[in-house]
C-alpha cells in the first residue's frame, strides 16, 4: 500500500507552467523581524496584481487538500503582508513586505498568493461595475517561526502502520524512513498536523518499527 504520508514535494510552491509574475524568494522564513519579497513582472505588458496571505491549517498535505484561512478573517493575525495591490510595468520589480505582528508559539505556515488581474471594459463602460479576468496566480510559502525552537517527533503505531507527529514547536524533517523495506523521500511533519504512514512494516529512524494489521 502506498504510504499516506505526504512527501516533501507536497508542501511546495504552487506555480503555473508559464506566468509573467514571479516571486523571489519563493520560500520565506520570518522570525521577529520583517522580511521582504520581490514581485517581478517578466511579461511584455503591464500587470496589476492583488496580494493575499492565508494561514495553512494543515501543512504537509498534498496541494489540492490544503485548507486555508485568510489572514484578513483572523481576529488577531500574527503576520501581515503589504501592500495588498500593486501595478508593475514590463520588467519591473517591486517589494512586498511581510511584517510579524505577534510572536507565535509554534511554527505557522502561510500561502502568499499573487494574482494578476486585468480589467475588461468591453464595448460599453459601466460606472457601477467592470468585468474582471484573473490570470494564473502564483503562490509562495511563508513560515513564521517562534523565538525558541524545539524539534521532536513521536511515532504511534496503529493497525494501518504508524502515525507521526511533531511534538516540538517547529517542523520535524523525517529522513531515512522505510515502508515495507522501501525507502521514502524525506518529508516534513508540522506541529498540530500529524501524518499517517501506512504499510505492513513502517520503520522511522530512532523509533521502534510499527507493524500494520496485515503485518506479523
Please give the residue ranges for each predicted region:
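Bacterial N-terminal signal peptides that target proteins for export
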Residues: 1-7
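Intrinsically disordered, low-complexity regulatory regions in eukaryotic proteins
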Residues: 19-89, 93-109, 113-216
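N-terminal signal peptide c-region/cleavage motif recognized by signal peptidases
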Residues: 9, 14-16
Amino acid at each position: 500500500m502506498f504510504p499516506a504520508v505526504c512527501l516533501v514535494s507536497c508542501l511546495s510552491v504552487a506555480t503555473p507552467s508559464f506566468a509573467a509574475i514571479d516571486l523571489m524568494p519563493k520560500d520565506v522564513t520570518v522570525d521577529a523581524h520583517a522580511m521582504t519579497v520581490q514581485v517581478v513582472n517578466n511579461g511584455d505588458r503591464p500587470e496589476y496584481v492583488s496580494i493575499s496571505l492565508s494561514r495553512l491549517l494543515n501543512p504537509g498535505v498534498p496541494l489540492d487538500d490544503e485548507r486555508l484561512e485568510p489572514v484578513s478573517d483572523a481576529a488577531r493575525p500574527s503576520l501581515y503582508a503589504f501592500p495588498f495591490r500593486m501595478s508593475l510595468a514590463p520588467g519591473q520589480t517591486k517589494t512586498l513586505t511581510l511584517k510579524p505582528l505577534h510572536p507565535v508559539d509554534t511554527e505557522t505556515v502561510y500561502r502568499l498568493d499573487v494574482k494578476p488581474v486585468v480589467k475588461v471594459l468591453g464595448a460599453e463602460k459601466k460606472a457601477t461595475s467592470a468585468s474582471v479576468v484573473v490570470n494564473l496566480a502564483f503562490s509562495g510559502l511563508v513560515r513564521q517561526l517562534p523565538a525558541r525552537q524545539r524539534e521532536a517527533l513521536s511515532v504511534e503505531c496503529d493497525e494501518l502502520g504508524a502515525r507521526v507527529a511533531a511534538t516540538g514547536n517547529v517542523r520535524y524533517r523525517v529522513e531515512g524512513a522505510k515502508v515495507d523495506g522501501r525507502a521514502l523521500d524525506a518529508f516534513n511533519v508540522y506541529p498540530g498536523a500529524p501524518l499517517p504512514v501506512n504499510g505492513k512494516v513502517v520503520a522511522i529512524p530512532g523509533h521502534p518499527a510499527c507493524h500494520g494489521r496485515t503485518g506479523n
